[in-house]
């Protein structure tokens, strides 16, 4: 068994099941910077990022992540800009490998297991949910404007390893990073200057 060297004592939240299917849209996957997603303690390198699928493929059992030497998994999920997250869904098997508890941390890039000894922004007790019918709301005060999410799977339902098929995030994109906006603005102005001679004088004076 691995020893990651962290502890916690915060009370987790109990979330009721949401009846019916497709009650929420978990479509924030398009705003995840997938190339930079990392998963610690995954048994197969690169498997962790594959559980962030489009909602229509959430029932796919061919791609999944399984923990390596104990039940813990730590996902570091950067976004392509600032986002507001309002809820999540997690699909596993209906057995002891399904995650039972997660701890969420916002805007802490490249977290390690040692970093998880700090207080989480939210803790959630999970239900065994092989069909993705349970929605777990996230705290608006904590996840209203973030650029990175870390998810620690802190416990499962009794197996040595944890297996996850799908993690869906719902919310909305807020805005791009300021640095990226500044670069785009600079490049746009540079292109205009390159074509200055093609712009009538009256218009050019108003632009430059």
Swiss-Prot record:
Protein known as: PITH domain-containing protein ZK353.9
Annotated organism of origin: Caenorhabditis elegans
Similarity comment text for this entry: Belongs to the PITHD1 family.
Cross-referenced Pfam families: PITH
Domain of life assignment: Eukaryota
Domain PITH: 17-189
A Gene Ontology term for the protein's cellular component: cytoplasm
